[in-house]
Amino acid sequence: MTLAGIFIGGGLGAMLRFWLGNVITAKTKGLSLPIGILTVNILGALGLGIFTGLHVANASVSLIIGTGFFGAFTTFSTFSVETIQLLMAKRVKESILYIVLTLCGSLFAFWCGWTITI
């Protein structure tokens, strides 16, 4: 049951990431950073922070939502690809900014989500 739940949660998270990332990217065309995935990763970190702060006792629910949904909603691999693409295009300043915004923004968002549930 838990494995099926992770599968379903992951599918939903991935579909939401795909849709939201594309919507944000379309609305921010012309900007020098990949804002779609940046936003998705920060929102995912915030959501996971809130969920983690709730201290859900049911291990299956934690796996389905934490590992399944939020694991698929956020994406370190796409962040990595986009960073390398910026570097290969010799857009070093943008790549550094993207790295800093993604890492610091995600950590801060997780912390905010976690602390508001305390």
Curated annotation (Swiss-Prot):
Top-level lineage group: Bacteria
Notes on how activity is controlled: Na(+) is not transported, but it plays an essential structural role and its presence is essential for fluoride channel function.
Any one GO CC term of the record: plasma membrane
Cell compartment(s), UniProt: Cell membrane
Membrane topology: Multi-pass membrane protein
A Pfam family reported for this protein in Swiss-Prot or TrEMBL: CRCB
Reaction(s) catalysed by this chain's protein: fluoride(in) = fluoride(out)
GO biological process, one term: cellular detoxification of fluoride
Binding-site residues for Na(+), renumbered to this chain: 71, 74
Sample GO molecular function, one term: fluoride transmembrane transporter activity
Positions of transmembrane segments: 4-24, 31-51, 61-81, 96-116
Keywords from the named record: Cell membrane, Ion channel, Ion transport, Membrane, Metal-binding, Sodium, Transmembrane, Transmembrane helix, Transport
Principal cellular location given in the protein's record: membrane
Sequence similarity: Belongs to the fluoride channel Fluc/FEX (TC 1.A.43) family.
Function, in words: Fluoride-specific ion channel. Important for reducing fluoride concentration in the cell, thus reducing its toxicity.
PANTHER family reported for this sequence: FLUORIDE EXPORT PROTEIN 1-RELATED (PTHR28259), FLUORIDE-SPECIFIC ION CHANNEL FLUC 2 (PTHR28259:SF16)
The name this protein goes by in its record: Fluoride-specific ion channel FluC 1
Organism of provenance: Bacillus subtilis (strain 168)
Gene: fluC1
